[in-house]
């Protein structure tokens, strides 16, 4: 049986832009994409800490420090909002004991503070 498991997240990123007239997506600093092993056009869930909005979109590479919501998503976040960007993967149950997500922690300028591979939580059955 496969389970949907957190694959990677960028924790408490600060929204730097909202472009309603762009064709959808979220622009993310390429350094953050690399740290979390995100790929262009990957589906991500966005959790807005400021207002509780939760929605899905896809990733495109952005400029250094950039976290910009594009298209319809621009209505759900404002510059200055704090968000969590999460990606999930289907993992076979027998692989869960070895699976570890990428956890990317950033400061208020979206600079990487730390990247962790979660070893604290172990799957037990």
From Swiss-Prot:
UniProt keyword terms in alphabetical order: Autocatalytic cleavage, Cytoplasm, Decarboxylase, Lyase, Pantothenate biosynthesis, Pyruvate, Schiff base, Zymogen
Modification Pyruvic acid (Ser), positions: 25
Origin organism lineage: Bacteria, Pseudomonadati, Aquificota, Aquificia, Aquificales
Name of the featured protein: Aspartate 1-decarboxylase
CDD domains, alphabetized: Asp_decarbox (cd06919)
GO cellular component: cytosol
Enzyme Commission no: 4.1.1.11
Biological process terms in GO annotation: alanine biosynthetic process; pantothenate biosynthetic process
SUPFAM superfamilies: ADC-like
PANTHER family per record: ASPARTATE 1-DECARBOXYLASE
Active-site feature positions: 25 (schiff-base intermediate with substrate), 58 (proton donor)
